[in-house]
Amino acid sequence: MTVTTPFVNGTSYCTVTAYSVQSYKAAIDFYTKFLSLENRSSPDENSTLLSNDSISLKILLRPDEKINKNVEAHLKELNSITKTQDWRSHATQSLVFNTSDILAVKDTLNAMNAPLQGYPTELFPMQLYTLDPLGNVVGVTSTKNAVSTKPTPPPAPEASAESGLSSKVHSYTDLAYRMKTTDTYPSLPKPLNRPQKAIAVMTSGGDAPGMNSNVRAIVRSAIFKGCRAFVVMEGYEGLVRGGPEYIKEFHWEDVRGWSAEGGTNIGTARCMEFKKREGRLLGAQHLIEAGVDALIVCGGDGSLTGADLFRSEWPSLIEELLKTNRISNEQYERMKHLNICGTVGSIDNDMSTTDATIGAYSALDRICKAIDYVEATANSHSRAFVVEVMGRNCGWLALLAGIATSADYIFIPEKPATSSEWQDQMCDIVSKHRSRGKRTTIVVVAEGAIAADLTPISPSDVHKVLVDRLGLDTRITTLGHVQRGGTAVAYDRILATLQGLEAVNAVLESTPDTPSPLIAVNENKIVRKPLMESVKLTKAVAEAIQAKDFKRAMSLRDTEFIEHLNNFMAINSADHNEPKLPKDKRLKIAIVNVGAPAGGINSAVYSMATYCMSQGHRPYAIYNGWSGLARHESVRSLNWKDMLGWQSRGGSEIGTNRVTPEEADLGMIAYYFQKYEFDGLIIVGGFEAFESLHQLERARESYPAFRIPMVLIPATLSNNVPGTEYSLGSDTALNALMEYCDVVKQSASSTRGRAFVVDCQGGNSGYLATYASLAVGAQVSYVPEEGISLEQLSEDIEYLAQSFEKAEGRGRFGKLILKSTNASKALSATKLAEVITAEADGRFDAKPAYPGHVQQGGLPSPIDRTRATRMAIKAVGFIKDNQAAIAEARAAEENFNADDKTISDTAAVVGVKGSHVVYNSIRQLYDYETEVSMRMPKVIHWQATRLIADHLVGRKRVD
């Protein structure tokens, strides 16, 4: 690292203090490596002087056990918030240095395995921060002045033969890094001076939406990394048959447009022959003949088990092939090892160790839409419908469909009852719902549903009970293979793409001793798991069910599955049974919608209200936002019958607008809070809701009525609320935009040489445009975080022209350019299309397309519905748990301290970080982690996705 100016403030000497011998030695080692300092002090047990030509740093040892414990606790706290909060807001001391090469700093910190935060982004930082062993925040900046705001991307390294094959370093294995690429389409890195690896991909077992996205990502990332890409047609059947007809080399353009197609374009088939050794022997021979030395399998547990067996037998298979003269000595030496990797393509979501499988959310989407449609006809005739869904031994589809459609009853294999119990339970719930005026009855049956004695429960059994015992006009709907059909939803396309990239990384990094990896998603991060261990855990569920050990079967499911089941039972009972809480623990809780409509808002209101009823709380709705309350006292207690159907409706049933409390009338709002004696408040909405919570929390000193627990559930398609990686409505909006883009792309494909510039909403957030770009394979995307430079625009026009030339004579010809509305104030989508058309000089033309408020979506997606339910119930729990913390403060008016952390923490944002639900104080978020003028969080968590999207379409980025 080159330190050109010692400290940002110009000083050249600094002293830091260690309070234990261990931290003292660690600090000497840290600063020696980090700042390339030399130890220039004479031997001394209590101090060390480190320096170079620009800096002198003295480290003192002052042993103090008490202070050292505090330092260790502070350091532990800072490490725990590395990915979620800005260290600078928690720092007691900090040092900041200047550097001429911030990339070298980043590489040094990565080599040291030191924690790291970068601003404005970790990809292209102007400032980098780490933690020293003494609890200090140590920063480095490349800017020349303190108010510089334009990030300077680090220089890209030249590709060389020494580039490491590790996803932990920047190389061909990391598509989320900016590197020098060629000027021609597709823009790829210069080839390395090493033998080309040949990577094949195959899909096996049952097809699943998203498999094509997985294949596309594997083929293109393999090519991007200098490898040859092959596909094995018709699954294991293609391996056994072999030859160029079944093992084909694919090139960049061969997978163009595949993301928008359902099923698997390379085919899949069940192959009994591969289960025999002779079949696997043929498969090995055919792979060797094609020169393939790495295989990625996308399929379920059976397909992945076969792949791992194939790899374990590989040494003996090739020995036998050599002995029988079916391969040459040269082939034997070159193909001694086969690297295998698995990605899970299954609509059942039954694979242990991963939170989601490719295709599961698409199948759930089909089921929910089908039930939404069925409910309309059920309501017309006051009928009951028994809906059978897939899932084998996993009840995930049935459970989440039950939550998303507010079904009356569900049958899942993990929680069976005796034959008489399930009949009594179902009839009790259905009759209670009917007696309260519900005209429809929906019962969801998983195909693996069983009674406690392992007797299968069929839709016919359920139909018979509903007819015979309740006299309901009942119909059976078996969705069957409709659940597998159609194009993948946005989540599955993105998941399949990111897992495809990591699968290529995994096979490139594998050694003969590395266990076969499975690419999984845990806490929203793509990770590798041992393949066979995952398969064994998956099969253990079925074994536990067969052994009637249902407690173990449930324990093998992830904690979120159990939470969903408890949530379903709570919201389904509503106020039909005796409340769980005693009268003195029951609360009055209000809910209000603030900001623009977003998918899932109604689901949150419905779930909050029904959960409150089941506990004994009284739910209130504030209609038409803060202005409705201040002007018209629009407050109403919610009752169950009035909310029927809300779980699956779009928009906002209780009304919403962008008015904040200060704009409406804080005094009147406080008056009505006091009049109705609210014990808690839930706000659902976007950045205006975030502002509202901030204003109410700040007003607590003046208005005692606001001294109650208050919580915000983020809901906005922009996904720009600080404190969460996910806002309700963003998935619905992403799917609406994706479907619009698919249709527009089809139109562009029909007209040769046509590109569409699609205007995306999102305010100053590029989330929607970024993820839609990845999901639909857009050639270019422009977002507010980067803007539109003339140099990049010129490069993009030339790149588009070349891509049209390459695609000549092929199908799926259309091109898409996504532009966030605020990416440029000067260039609207219309103006941008005109500029592109003029500069293209007749080689192609561009037209604008405005999806507008269509992006808010119609029916909310199942992801938004189920997450709304989860977050609403968490919000009610937060209010209940924080009553005691603020109760005393409410009573002691004179001694009220709004700055007390215990008090300020009772106003929070409930958010999703990874797969965890977290609570962040509104004061902490607003003061330290928000760019208020930009209506954005300071840390952009989706930044790396942009480079992945660009690399997968061969776009060249201009630094």
From Swiss-Prot:
Q: A GO BP term, please?
A: proton transmembrane transport
Record-listed Phosphoserine modification sites = S163, S171, S803
- High-level lineage: Eukaryota, Fungi, Dikarya, Ascomycota, Saccharomycotina
Instruction: State the membrane topology.
Output: Peripheral membrane protein
Name the UniProt record assigns to this protein: ATP-dependent 6-phosphofructokinase subunit beta
Q: Which gene is transcribed and translated to give this protein? A: PFK2
Q: Name one GO cellular component term.
A: cytoplasm
Ligand binding (beta-D-fructose 6-phosphate 2): S346, I347, D348, M390, G391, R392, E447, H481, V482, Q483, R484
By sequence similarity, the record places it as follows: Belongs to the phosphofructokinase type A (PFKA) family. ATP-dependent PFK group I subfamily. Eukaryotic two domain clade 'E' sub-subfamily.
Q: Which cofactor does it need?
A: Mg(2+)
